[in-house]
């Protein structure tokens, strides 16, 4: 029965806190986010430092990433996609690297006074912040293009749908945040449980599966963000 005690002892998402201005912040989330941003910046700098007409090495990878993100934005946003490609690309890269960091970086080897390090996206505060930022962005996109006429979409095609259309603006960030948080947290929890039971062999395929699903989650989030922006920009 000892293995049952091992499973019950598995914890994901423990926190240590920093106090700033009377507010309690999850310190490890900030540390992990800075590490992720540092990795993204380092990748961008090293792969674009010596650009050549015929790309090779890291420049090939950088151009592939840029073209991939641009295609997502073009497909989802439409005619005005170039203006919103940087935002969609930033979301995609931050979520993608955050998710992969949880699977590839041995965070547990770094000891903290309290809590543990892990992927920023396994914290609900991170995913909610990303979802709210997405909501604010598509509101801004609609208001920038249409002005106050943007709010006319809430009574289209009939004013009876006003409550449903308003409710939709609340469900979008909820679905974005909980989908990402739930998938990443569940993946880390399953791997942690299996590692406690069979430390070497069985968890390895699940780690590769986690890498795949982590990439898919980043793609889904970025695609939906682009779709929401495109919806805000299109005519009634």
Swiss-Prot record:
InterPro entries: ATP_syn_F0_a_bact/chloroplast (IPR045082), ATP_synth_F0_asu (IPR000568), ATP_synth_F0_asu_AS (IPR023011), F0_ATP_A_sf (IPR035908). GO terms for cellular component: chloroplast thylakoid membrane; plasma membrane; proton-transporting ATP synthase complex. The keyword Plastid applies. F-type ATPases have 2 components, CF(1) - the catalytic core - and CF(0) - the membrane proton channel. CF(1) has five subunits: alpha(3), beta(3), gamma(1), delta(1), epsilon(1). CF(0) has four main subunits: a, b, b' and c. This is ATP synthase subunit a, chloroplastic. Belongs to the ATPase A chain family. One of its GO terms (molecular function) is proton-transporting ATP synthase activity, rotational mechanism. It comes from Ostreococcus tauri. It is a multi-pass membrane protein. Its main location: plastid. PROSITE patterns: ATPASE_A (PS00449). It is found in: Plastid, Chloroplast thylakoid membrane. Key component of the proton channel; it plays a direct role in the translocation of protons across the membrane. Pfam families: ATP-synt_A (PF00119). NCBIfam families: ATP_synt_6_or_A. SUPFAM superfamilies: F1F0 ATP synthase subunit A. The keyword Nucleotide-binding does not apply.
């Amino acid at each position: 029965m000892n293995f049952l005690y091992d499973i019950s002892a598995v914890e994901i998402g423990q926190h240590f806190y920093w106090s700033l201005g009377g507010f309690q912040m999850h310190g490890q989330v900030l540390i992990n986010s800075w590490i992720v941003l540092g990795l993204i910046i380092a990748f961008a700098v090293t792969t674009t430092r010596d650009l050549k007409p015929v790309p090779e090495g890291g420049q090939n990878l950088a151009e592939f990433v840029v073209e991939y993100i641009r295609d997502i934005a073009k497909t989802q946003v439409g005619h005005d996609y170039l203006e919103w490609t940087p935002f969609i690309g930033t979301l995609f890269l931050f979520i993608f690297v955050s998710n992969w960091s949880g699977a590839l970086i041995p965070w547990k080897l770094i000891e903290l006074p309290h809590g543990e390090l892990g992927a920023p996206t396994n914290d609900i505060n991170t995913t909610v912040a990303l979802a709210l930022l997405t909501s604010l962005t598509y509101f801004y996109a609609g208001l920038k293009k249409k002005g106050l006429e943007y709010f006319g979409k809430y009574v289209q095609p009939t004013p009876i749908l006003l409550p449903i259309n308003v409710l939709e603006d609340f469900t979008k960030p909820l679905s974005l945040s909980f989908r990402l948080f739930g998938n990443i947290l569940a993946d880390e929890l399953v791997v942690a449980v299996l590692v406690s039971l069979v430390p070497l062999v069985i968890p390895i395929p699940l780690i590769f599966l986690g890498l795949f699903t982590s990439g898919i989650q980043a793609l889904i989030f970025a695609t939906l963000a682009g779709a929401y922006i495109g919806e805000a920009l299109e005519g009634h």
